[in-house]
C-alpha cells in the first residue's frame, strides 16, 4: 500500500510527521501543524493510518503551496528579480551569494570551480 499525498509517494514505514517531510515545501513545524489540524498523532506510522485519516492529511496538505506549484513560484520570484534588475537579481544572474557574504576568499560552492587566469 503506497500512500500518495500531493503527487508524492510518502514512505509508509515512517511516522506521519517524518513522512510528510518527503513533500517539497513541508518541514518539521508544518508537518506537526498538519497532523494537529487533521487530528492525527504525529508518531503514528503511515501504514497504520486509515483511508479517512489519509484523506484528512491530503485535505490539510492541499491548503498549502507545495511541490510543483511552490517550485514554480520560487523560480518565478527569482526570474522577476532578475528582470527588474534588483541587487538580488543581479547576484542570481552572476551566480554569486545574495546576502552579503564575502566572495574574495569563500563562496566556492556558489561560484563553481576555480577558473585559471588567462593572460
UniProtKB/Swiss-Prot annotation:
CC terms in the record's Gene Ontology section: cytosol; small ribosomal subunit
Pfam families documented for this protein: Ribosomal_S13
Keyword annotations of the record: Ribonucleoprotein, Ribosomal protein, RNA-binding, rRNA-binding, tRNA-binding
Region (Disordered): 90-119
Gene Ontology molecular function, alphabetical: rRNA binding; structural constituent of ribosome; tRNA binding
PANTHER family per UniProt: 30S RIBOSOMAL PROTEIN S13/40S RIBOSOMAL PROTEIN S18 (PTHR10871), SMALL RIBOSOMAL SUBUNIT PROTEIN US13M (PTHR10871:SF1)
Binding partners and assembly: Part of the 30S ribosomal subunit. Forms a loose heterodimer with protein S19. Forms two bridges to the 50S subunit in the 70S ribosome.
Family: Belongs to the universal ribosomal protein uS13 family.
Protein name stated in the entry: Small ribosomal subunit protein uS13
Source organism: Coxiella burnetii (strain Dugway 5J108-111)
Phylogenetic placement of the source organism: Bacteria, Pseudomonadati, Pseudomonadota, Gammaproteobacteria, Legionellales
Amino acid at each position: 500500500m503506497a500512500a500518495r499525498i500531493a503527487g508524492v509517494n510518502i514512505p509508509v514505514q515512517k511516522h506521519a510527521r517524518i513522512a510528510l517531510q518527503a513533500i517539497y515545501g513541508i518541514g518539521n513545524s508544518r508537518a506537526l501543524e498538519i497532523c494537529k489540524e487533521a487530528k492525527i498523532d504525529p508518531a503514528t506510522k503511515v501504514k497504520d493510518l486509515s483511508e479517512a485519516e489519509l484523506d484528512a492529511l491530503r485535505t490539510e496538505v492541499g491548503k498549502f503551496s507545495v511541490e510543483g506549484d511552490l517550485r514554480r513560484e520560487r523560480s518565478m520570484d527569482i526570474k522577476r528579480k532578475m528582470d527588474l534588475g534588483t541587487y538580488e537579481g543581479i547576484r542570481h544572474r552572476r551566480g554569486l551569494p545574495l546576502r552579503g557574504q564575502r566572495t574574495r576568499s569563500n563562496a566556492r560552492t556558489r561560484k563553481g570551480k576555480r577558473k585559471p587566469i588567462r593572460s
